[in-house]
Structure formats: structure tokens, C-alpha cells
Amino acid sequence: FSSRLRLMLYATKEILFCKEKYQVLYAPSFRGIEPVIFLRALGLYRKPIVIWHHTAVVNSSGFAREQISRLFYKGIDKMFLFSRKLIQDSLKTRKAPAHKLKLVHWGPDLPFYDHLLAEMPDRKPEGFISTGKENRDVSTLFQAFAATKEKLDLYIAVSCGNINYKNIIDGFTLPDSIHVHYTDGVIPYELAKLVARKSCIVICCLDFPYTVGLTTLVEAFALGIPVICSRNPNFEIDIDKEGIGITVEYGDVQ
């Protein structure tokens, strides 16, 4: 749904008028089920609600918005988060007690990647690759690699959320060593094979308060490929300490 309001209306109708028996309402995020969460907070919806919360819970600006937000989180029975830091930051707001917050580690489908690598016995990893679509910092990425002769392949969506990557990329005059590929229509399996043929994965992200780039990071684990990654304090794993790559500060082009 392009409209969030249309999504909420559709999801709320489907949930409230669902004829199938169920015990728990589970959702990958609260997006679209906000009205049902408020109904739960008011005692008008009886099923427990369990969601993934991709960011830390934060305080809202203004007294009225803060009170509405507190009521909203009262309607969520359990939230899964990707790191302890996200949980710790959420607890500081006092909107969600500890018993509602659960750490769940995000990881790769190892049999999938084992099968993929088994199909590529003669692969000879070479060059750098950057993938993903959420809040990627393509400007820093290009500036950093343009100053080197290293080969980089960027696979990215034309746009994601409020960011139009194509507009940003079109503003650069790129050297022959940097190649951009738009991923619209590219299936994950084919993209994973392209990643597996590279010697290093670059995860260059904007500074957002959640685990930006985590899926790309766990894919690197599964493929055994080192990473150069923005230093995201929300990751559960210390990339430098574990020796799986190096991290750099946000916006660092050196």
C-alpha cells in the first residue's frame, strides 16, 4: 500500500472481522495495525499483540504526543528487538517495561548459503560489493572509493522510503572502477551469488537509531566474507573485536 492510511484501514478490517480462530496477533512491525494496538490499550481488543520493533522506543515531542505514545505502547504485549542497546534505550523512556522487551538475534539461513556456495566450487572472490536499500550513504561510499583504484559494484534500489538513490547517484561523475546496478526485479538468490564472488562487502549507512545494514552483515557472516561497515552502535556484534572486518565512523571518506 502506498498510503499508510489505506494500509491501516485494510489491516484493521481484516483483523477485526477475521473468522479464523487465533490466539495471538503477530506482526513484523506496528505499521498498519496501529488502530488495533490502540484498541488493545483501551481494552477493546482481547488478543495479545506481539511485534518486531526495529528501533528503540523513543520519547515524543510535546506533552499530548507523549501521552498518546504511552497509550500506544500499553497496547503491545511483547516486542522483539535486535540488540541489547535497543532494549536499554527503550527502557529509558519508561514506556515499555523489561518484561515486554525480548532480544532476538537476527541471523542468516545457513543451509541456504551452504547450498549456494556448493554450487560455486570454482569461485575466485575479487573486488568490493555494496548491497542493501535502507538508509544507505551512497555519497560517502562514492567519495571513499573514487579516491582509490579499487573496483566497487553497488547494487541498490532506485529508491527506498524517502531516499531517491538514483537522483543522488546521477549527481556523481563516477570513475570506471565504480559500477551501479539497480536491483528492481533482481531476486535475492541471484544477488547473493553476486555477493559470494566478491572479496569484501561494504556496508555504508546513514546514522539512524536502529540496526541499519544488519541483514547484509549476517549475510557476510554466512558467506565468510570480511566487511567494511559503518560503526553502528546498535549492532549486537563488535565487528572489530570479533575480527570479521573493520568499522569506520559515519561519513568518513578516508
Model-assigned labels for residue ranges:
Residues 11-32, 50-51:
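Short N-terminal targeting/anchoring amphipathic segment
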Residues 85, 107:
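Carbohydrate-associated surface elements
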Residues 91-92, 99-102, 108-125, 136-142:
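Acidic anion/phosphate-binding donor-loop and adjacent secondary structure
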Residues 193-210, 225:
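Acidic donor-binding loop of glycosyltransferase active sites
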Residues 24-26, 41-59, 106:
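Active-site proximal beta-strand in glycosyltransferases
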Residues 166-197:
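Nucleotide-activated donor-binding/catalytic signature segment of Leloir-type glycosyltransferases, i.e.
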Residues 12-21, 59-80:
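Membrane-proximal helix-turn-helix segments that form the acceptor-binding/catalytic region
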